[in-house]
């Protein structure tokens, strides 16, 4: 639902009875917002411990990305013991493997390649929220005058930064950053779903499939959970009669076909791994461990991943968890609570 009561793609050139040409401040312009998002995504990471690597994902991404990609083409790994079925390696064929391979070819320092990778994931999330809100019509209607127009533009920036910099990223950013890809792709998926509902053709469904190809492949459960967003969006669009059920069915079928077409390669790989590989989930995390951490209060403040709370002889497995379980605890609950109260008051 757009801010002016209308859903869907809107004509940004539509004005009221007394059109006024507005020159918004730099930070409330679309281009200015993008620069802010990009700066906050990249600059802090580049100045955070330059020259040092975080133990992120697969060590071979930094040691020998070419060999990792070469071996990822086969589900059988004879180098381990007497041979075994690989674990998630096939998912590194795109996009993480090629990125680190290219960085290695051009001679980029590993720490810099890692920071640019993480910054790109964060930037994709923030820019995705900005694009989603503009797709829904935020900032397109100037009828309310300068104050309303700039208020909506500022709201877009705040929403983008709140999503991009949420505590959720602390769970994965320096250990399993590849799991953040579905999170970064969610706002883009929602925007493409809305556009697929409003237009006829395969363009937006095809882009949806390519996006799913990019953000999926390593962790199927993360992608499936994120996929609930577009599904709920389709159902809600039909229930509130924003579009006909025929449109909903058509868009859903096109998106489903595109998703299966681009994702079948890694789905088959994960099925082979589940049937013949090591029972990794039974050895690392079980349902009890996961559910004990994923409580409603922790999910409310954007956390809840079991690994975030781990402790060892050398201290916390993830250092920021110490702050979020001590002095930052009240603040981490207060901010989302204030956001909900503000949304209810609008």
Residues covered by each model-derived region:
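Transmembrane signal-anchor helices characteristic of membrane glycosylation enzymes that use polyprenol
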Residues: 30-65, 257-273
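Membrane-embedded helix bundles of polyisoprenyl
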Residues: 42, 118-136, 152-240, 251-271, ...
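Intrinsically disordered, low-complexity terminal tails and inter-domain linkers enriched
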Residues: 7-18, 138-152
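A broad structural signal for alpha-helix termini and local helix breaks/kinks
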Residues: 106, 136-137, 147, 218
């Amino acid at each position: 639902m757009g801010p002016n009561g209308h859903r869907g793609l809107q004509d940004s050139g539509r004005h009221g009875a007394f059109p006024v040409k507005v020159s918004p401040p730099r930070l409330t312009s679309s281009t200015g917002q993008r620069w802010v998002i990009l700066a906050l995504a990249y600059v802090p990471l580049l100045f955070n411990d330059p020259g040092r690597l975080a133990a992120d994902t697969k060590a071979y991404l930094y040691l020998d990305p070419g060999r990792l990609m070469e071996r990822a083409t086969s589900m059988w790994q004879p180098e381990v013991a007497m041979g075994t079925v690989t674990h998630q390696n096939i998912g590194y064929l795109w996009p993480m493997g090629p990125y680190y391979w290219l960085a290695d070819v051009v001679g980029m320092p590993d720490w810099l390649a890692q920071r640019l990778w993480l910054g790109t994931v964060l930037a994709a999330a923030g820019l995705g929220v900005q694009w989603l809100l503009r797709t829904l019509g935020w900032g397109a209607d100037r009828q309310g005058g300068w104050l309303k127009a700039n208020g909506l533009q500022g709201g877009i920036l705040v929403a983008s930064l709140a999503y991009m910099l949420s505590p959720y990223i602390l769970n994965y950013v320096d250990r399993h950053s590849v799991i953040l890809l579905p999170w970064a792709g969610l706002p883009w998926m929602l925007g493409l779903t809305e556009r697929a509902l409003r237009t006829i053709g395969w363009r937006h469904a095809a882009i949806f499939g390519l996006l799913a190809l990019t953000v999926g492949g390593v962790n199927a459960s993360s992608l499936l959970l994120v996929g609930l967003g577009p599904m709920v969006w389709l159902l809600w669009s039909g229930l509130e009669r924003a579009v006909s059920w025929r449109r909903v069915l058509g868009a859903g079928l096109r998106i489903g076909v595109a998703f299966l077409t681009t994702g079948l390669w890694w789905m088959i790989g994960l099925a082979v791994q589940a049937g013949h590989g090591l029972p990794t989930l039974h050895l690392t995390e079980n349902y009890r461990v996961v559910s004990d951490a994923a409580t409603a209060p922790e999910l409310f403040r954007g956390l809840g991943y079991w690994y975030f709370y781990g402790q060892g002889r050398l201290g916390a497995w993830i250092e920021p968890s110490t702050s979020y379980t001590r002095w930052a605890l009240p603040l981490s609950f207060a901010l989302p609570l204030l956001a909900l109260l503000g949304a209810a008051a609008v």
